[in-house]
Each structure stands twice: as C-alpha cells, then as structure tokens.
Amino acid sequence: MTMIKIDQYFEPASWQKFTKAAEGRETPFLVVDLSRIETKYHEMVSLFPNAKLHYAMKASPAVEVINLLANLGSNFDCASIYELDRVLGCGVDPSRISYGNTIKKAEHVKYAFEKGIDLYATDSEADLKNIAKHAPGSKIFVRILVQGSETAEWPLSRKFGCHPNMAIDLLVQARELGLVPYGISFHVGSQQKDVAAWDDALSKVKYMFDWMKNEEGIKLQMINLGGGFPTNYISEVNPIKVYAEEITSYLTDDYNDDEMPEIILEPGRSLVGGSGVLVSDVVLISRKSDTDLTRWVYTDVGLFQGLIETLGEAIKYPVYTPKMETSTSEGTVVLAGPTCDSTDIMYEEAGYQLPEELEIGDKIYWLTTGAYTNSYSSVEFNGFPPLEVVYID
C-alpha cells in the first residue's frame, strides 16, 4: 500500500486548520472540523431533497455535533435511551427522533415513550409486544435482512433484521396490537461501495408494500433506507451524488409521484467521517528479528482508544506523517497500539508503507476518523483515558 499525499484529502487551508489545532497538545487526540460536517449535511440535503435525514448518533454522539445538526434541521436516530437523553438535552423536539435499535429493554421503550418518542424500529415479536405494551399507538417500522455484506467494509445485516416474510407477519400483528404499521427499514452495510445493494433491497421492499396493500389492506407509508453511504478512506469511492442519483432512480421506477412513500435516511459515517483527524505519536519502532524486513510501529493510539473499526483490518484509514512529503525510501510496517493486549494491532496484513526515516516521537495522523472513533473509545483500559476531542470550525 503506497504512501499517501495530504493533498489527496485536504486543501492546504483546510489541513492548516487541523495542524494548528494540534499544536502543543499531548497525543492522542481527535480534531473535528464542524464546518466539514455542515458542508456534507447541505450536500446530502440537496441530493436527497425529498428525504428526511435522521443522523445516526452512534457515529459521533458529541453535543457539539448534535447542536450543529439540530440547528441545520436534521432529525436524529437514537440507539439507546442514553443517546435519547443527550439529544433531548440539546433541545431537539421528540418528533424529530426515532428509536432505531431493534434490541431494547421494555423499560427503555416505556422511558422513550414517556419522553415523547412514537417511532420505533423492530424485528421480532417479543420487541413488538414490548412496544405495544409500553408505547401504545406508536408507529413501527420493521427491519428486514438484505444482501450487501459482501461489498460493505463493515457488514450490519446479520444481527439486525428479519426475513421479509416474518416482517410481513409483524406488520400485520402490529395492527392487531393497536400499533401503526408504518414502514420498512433495511441497512445494506456500512461503507457500502456497491450502489446496486440498495436496488436489491428496494425490490424486496416494493414487493412487501404491494403485498401489504393488496393482501392485508395495510398501506405502508415509509421506507427507511438506513445509512451505509461511504466516505473516503484508502480505497476510492464514488461521490455521494452517484448514490443519490441511482437510489432516486430506483424509487421513481417503483413508485408514482402520488404513491411515493416517506423516505428516511440514517447517515452517520458519510456525514461526519471526513471531519476528523486523529493525531498520535510514534511510541516505539522495532523488528522481531535481525533479518525481519517489516518494522513494527507502535503508536499511542490503538483499538481501545478509538480505532476499533480496524478490527480484522475492516476499515483502512489513510495514515499520514509529514515525512512522507520528503521521504526517499519507504518500507512495510505493522501498525499497533499501546495497550497490553495482543489484539491491539491495527494493520498487519494490509501492507501499509511508512518512511524509513520515521522515528520515535514523530506524529502520525489518521485521516477520515470523524466517525466511530471517539464514540468507541474505551474508558481507562490499561489506565489509558478516553480519547480527547478538539472541535474547530
């Protein structure tokens, strides 16, 4: 994997903002440029003008991010009552919030309903009955299993969702339980590169919409397309415009203007991923034998300080050090974290290249780390504190 150049990811003025914010701070820490989130939000709204954006809070649940998106008009998808409390604490009206986790305690459903939440995801009879009991009259959408894990870097359709036939049964049962069978949701997998994955999922949804209307007399009103839109890591991805055009085409092929259901998107990674740069120091450089050609580069950030998505080398972050700009020689490295856990290795098989001139104390910048880093950072594993975050705009 060849070394990168910083101008592949940032304009000079934008990169200068990050480096200025990093001056004089003890590593590791994450720098988040809120203006980049705002720009991305406006882009998504313009490309999906008829959709409601429900920001997937799990990507970065920081108050600074919530306040920004709330002021821009975003809705929010919560995965827990703890995220719910945070977004409500920012003054967001409950009508702008969905409870999108299909796995939730009965008492948490009750709590959310008491706070004004009336839109819930489900994928099982037990959860559906909990919603009926503790959030009577609420709108529910059933999450279905779809294809796409083969082309997603972070698959999400095993733990969540049910077979479309079961989803139909749940929607019928929802009506019998006094709930509103509102719609269907799916997720094609995070960092999904194949736009055709949405076409396959939407075909299943169209069949279910027609079945529910013709066989059960239930007119579903909403499709939740989830997230999955990719951001720029090591591998090149199509711009979001390509996804928007194709998905819009799929929808208009399936539904007339007067039949078009409400569309919900749950962007997370695609909204905030490009806003972050994680700054770390090189702690140690070593080799495992005198003849080993591969250097082990240990940094003061690892899986437990925010880089958990490198598990299995799934997400491949762009890794940058200023010496890349002048280096005349590079070599393959293993990148590992600082903890006393043998799994704390970010990249061993990917073949990352770093300058031979790299030294202990040099800075390493992990680009495109605005999503699923600070929210995953552990609390004091091996005594290391949670990842510090610096916000700029």
Placement of each model-derived feature along the sequence:
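Short, solvent-exposed polar/charged micro-motifs at secondary-structure junctions
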Residues: 40-42, 63-67, 193, 273-275, ...
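Short glycine-rich, flexible loops that bind phosphorylated cofactors or substrates
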Residues: 129, 149, 373
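A charged N-terminal "starter" segment
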Residues: 1-138, 176, 180, 214, ...
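Charged (often Lys/Glu-rich) extended helix/loop segments that serve as interaction or gating elements
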Residues: 246, 252, 258-393
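Short, glycine/charged-enriched secondary-structure capping and boundary segments
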Residues: 68-69, 91-93, 113-114, 134-137, ...
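Active-site loop/helix belt of alpha/beta enzymes
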Residues: 148-286, 346, 382-384
